[in-house]
Design a protein with these regions (language model features):
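Helical element adjacent to the flavin cofactor pocket in flavoenzyme catalytic cores
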Residues: 185-233
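N-terminal glycine-rich dinucleotide-binding loop that anchors FAD/FMN and/or NAD(P) in oxidoreductases
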Residues: 47-72
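N-terminal Rossmann-like FAD-binding beta1-loop-alpha1 element of flavoenzymes
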Residues: 4-34
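Mobile amphipathic helical/loop "lid" adjacent to a hydrophobic cofactor/ligand pocket
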Residues: 66-70, 74, 79-179, 194-195, ...
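Glycine-rich FAD pyrophosphate-binding loop
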Residues: 26-50
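Conserved beta-strand segments of alpha/beta enzyme cores
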Residues: 31, 54, 79, 219-221
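Catalytic P-loop NTPase motifs of RecA-like helicase/translocase cores
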Residues: 19, 41-42, 229
């Protein structure tokens, strides 16, 4: 099927945002086409098969509590492989294990005895978890406008616990360890980690964009680079 000469909407890029937008427009009966210069859909969510192994490009993980993810995808069909909630923390001398006793009660003794932070720090994590889960997800954005670092200090966490647990953990989420990211995002992501699982599709992260793209069929054009955009045309 050739690229249409006329259409209501041209979406440039077949990553998750472009595909989700296309599905919404398709549901409303709007003519559209999705163009992407790559050889497959997915954007940054791509997987390769190498010598019988499926390798995701970069660090990839899905949080099953994402509301838009649940609206846009059939998670059961992805055969998600779920990680046990918790973390291993290197203290400089040994690995310490912190688990989620709310979902895995057997993790409670190990988490309490872990030489990471204080008992008060761990109680504050539990209280923060329960407070965030007791509210709708969007209320995470209603709090004060300050940095995540300031938020953690306002919550009463010790500097040692912030450095040992929150900086490495959130540094991987925010891609910055100074924790200058908005506290609203911290509250939202922390709630997502507490409310659902971290998981990966059994056949690679690319299965997610492929699944979202399936109903679009030939409306998605890969190997199609966009060279210019104007008010009247996309070429």
């Amino acid at each position: 099927m050739e690229i249409p000469q006329r259409t209501d909407v041209v979406i440039v890029g077949a990553g998750l945002s472009g595909l989700a937008c296309a599905r919404l427009l398709q549901a409303e009966g709007i003519d559209l086409v999705v163009l992407d210069s790559s050889d497959a859909v997915g954007g940054r969510m791509r997987s390769d098969q190498v010598e019988g192994f499926i390798l995701d490009r970069g660090f990839q993980v899905l949080l099953t509590a994402y509301e838009e993810l649940n609206r846009s995808a059939n998670l059961n069909a992805l055969d998600l492989q779920r990680f046990k909630p918790g973390s291993l923390i290197w203290t400089g001398k040994r690995l310490e294990r912190l688990g989620d006793p709310f979902r895995n009660p057997t993790a409670l003794p190990t988490s309490i005895l872990a030489r990471v932070g204080t008992i008060e720090d761990k109680l504050r994590v539990a209280l923060l978890r329960q407070r965030l889960l007791s509210r709708p997800a969007q209320m995470a954005f209603d709090g004060p406008d300050r940095t995540t670092e300031d938020e953690l200090r306002q919550e009463g966490f010790s500097e040692a616990f912030i450095d040992q647990f929150f900086r490495p953990f959130l540094g991987g989420v925010f891609l910055e360890r100074d924790l200058k990211t908005s506290a609203s995002l911290f509250r939202y992501y922390f709630r997502c980690f507490a409310a659902g699982d971290a998981a990966v599709p059994a056949f690679g992260i690319q299965r997610l964009p492929e699944q979202i793209a399936e109903p679009l069929g030939a409306l998605v054009k890969v190997n199609t680079a966009v060279r210019s955009i104007s008010n009247e045309a996309v070429t």
